A protein has these predicted regions:
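Contiguous, well-ordered alpha-helical segments that form the cores/surfaces of helical PPI scaffolds
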Residues: 65-76, 88, 92-94, 234-235
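Basic, short loop/linker segments at the boundary and entry of helix-turn-helix/winged-helix-like folds
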Residues: 24-73, 78
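Anion-binding and metal-coordination hotspots
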Residues: 79-91, 102-464
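Short hydrophobic/aromatic segments of transmembrane alpha-helices and their interfaces
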Residues: 11-13, 97, 138, 350-351
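Catalytic micro-motifs at enzyme active sites that drive phosphoryl/nucleotidyl and oxygen chemistry
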Residues: 58-60, 99-105
Length: 464
């Protein structure tokens, strides 16, 4: 066989679709079957009709809402963080064009088209789409709703720390350090002098003194890895019930500088509203617990004298891990004391311990799928509302993946080759195990059959 060489080939001017050998992806085919069975496109088109022109003025038609929301779901399934990345990925594979409902000879929507479609569609509409996917899960008996776990995580904003400016004077951080150096007697400070001066300062990056002109909603925050960035905070409410499978009941994007106790009530209210919408829908009302959102499982950051009584007023029983605070005084705070002691009794019981273990398992898994493998730990959108729109559809994609895992054993399209590799490894291990058994049998010699045994050792033969 002669050596083949790579040559510069002129592409053909015309090619038929039959020659492209287009193949769909089985995972995305399954997702489309579920969405089509519940009339997803009809729902979102009716929901978004008010944000589009009626067509009387002519012009190019806008991007279909069903395609727009599917593009954002592709961001979750493929682990893509930016709209430019979604644009590139959808145009790279014909299988994704089929998932979006586009002909293979037409380009997928570009990043500017996705951005232009996102801006007029308000946040409440994105929340309605998230609620629709939650109803799909409830229709498949994957939502219980009685017990919810709440946790938060930080998302790095699309703004650099070097761009922050003073709230009072508007000067940048470098200019601020140079002014401090001159006030301390250094006329021409070097970079080493500025770094030394910066290390000696205390409270050098306070949200009360500094802001980002690129992202006013982003706040200076210490991330989980110990670094400091401008960030937003995402808070999840996840189904932890006995019959639940860890579906996201609500998600909100909050001020990163606000403590967990300040944002908990809003997330609980959002989860309650979503579950109330399920209870009001006669198609799924019998598949959701009648005592929806009656228990909240929380971490140590949510335990406070104000939070626990607030939850009791909302008829929500708390299972909050209690931090070590030593001996406490409860002068004039009888309600807070009663709520704290009741929470302590529940946490120390068997059910409380089981729920806290379930919280550590399902909540951590949710954050990992949405923000680590889902590619949303670093944001490329500016403005808290735009971030919340993307996070809501991202969480809806997580719930769709949960349904796929329960029905087909695959949460994401990348799970398909992983499952095939696991099956091949299992078959290989079984073959090796059988080979070892055969080799051991050959080493010990043939096993005597009952006819080959002496008469006295063979009870099956009659005595002589």
């Amino acid at each position: 066989m002669a050596l083949g060489k790579r040559k510069v080939v002129q592409q053909p001017l015309f090619v038929t679709v039959a020659d492209l050998n287009v193949r769909s992806h089985p995972f995305y085919d399954a997702v489309n079957k579920v969405l089509d069975a519940h009339h997803f496109d009809v729902f979102v088109e009716g929901l978004c009709a008010g944000f589009y022109d009626d067509g009387t003025r002519g012009g190019r038609p806008g991007l279909a809402p069903g395609i727009y929301f599917r593009c954002l779901m592709v961001g979750y399934f493929e682990g893509i963080d930016s709209e430019r990345g979604i644009d590139w990925r959808c145009n790279d594979g014909n299988a994704l064009k089929l998932f979006l409902g586009l002909p293979v000879d037409k380009p997928a929507p570009g990043h500017s088209t996705i951005s232009r479609t996102r801006r007029p569609i308000d946040l409440e509409t994105h929340a309605q789409v998230f609620r629709f996917i939650l109803k799909v899960l409830a229709n498949h008996s994957l939502v219980e709703g009685k017990t919810a776990g709440v946790d938060s995580t930080t998302l790095e904003a699309n703004a650099a720390m070097r761009s922050i400016v003073r709230r009072d004077t508007g000067e940048g951080y470098q200019q601020f350090l140079e002014r401090l150096a001159k006030e301390s007697g250094i006329e021409t400070p070097t970079r080493e002098d500025l770094a030394k001066l910066d290390r000696r300062r205390k409270n050098k990056a306070s949200n009360d003194d500094w802001r980002s002109p690129d992202g006013p909603d982003a706040k200076i925050t210490k991330m989980k890895d110990g670094t400091t960035h401008l960030a937003h905070k995402a808070e999840h409410a996840v189904d932890l019930g006995e019959g639940g499978h860890g579906a996201i009941l609500a998600v909100s994007v909050c001020d990163a500088a606000a403590g967990d106790t300040a944002t908990l009530v809003d997330t609980v209210v959002a989860a309650t509203e979503n579950l109330a919408a399920l209870a009001d829908d006669e198609r799924v009302s019998d598949k959701v617990s009648g005592r929806w959102m009656s228990e909240a499982v929380l971490g140590k950051g949510y335990h406070s004298r104000q939070t626990l009584p607030d939850l009791e007023e909302m008829s929500v029983r708390s299972y909050a891990s209690e931090p070590q605070r030593g001996r406490q005084r409860w002068d004039g705070q009888a309600d807070a004391r009663q709520a704290a002691y009741a929470n302590r009794r529940r946490v120390r019981g068997e059910r409380g311990k089981r729920l806290l273990r379930s919280r550590g398992e399902k909540l951590e898994r949710t954050s990992a799928h949405c923000y680590e493998t889902g590619g949303m730990r670093r944001l490329y959108l500016r403005g808290r509302e735009n971030v919340a729109k993307r996070v809501l559809v991202h969480a809806a994609g997580f719930n769709v993946g949960l349904l796929m895992r329960v029905r087909y054993g695959l949460r994401k399209p990348r799970s398909l080759p992983a499952a095939a590799a696991a099956a091949r490894a299992l078959i290989f291990a079984l073959v090796e195990w059988l080979r070892s058994i055969v080799a051991a049998a050959r080493a010990t010699g043939p096993v005597a059959s009952p006819r080959q045994l002496p008469d006295r050792c063979n009870p099956a033969l009659p005595a002589a």
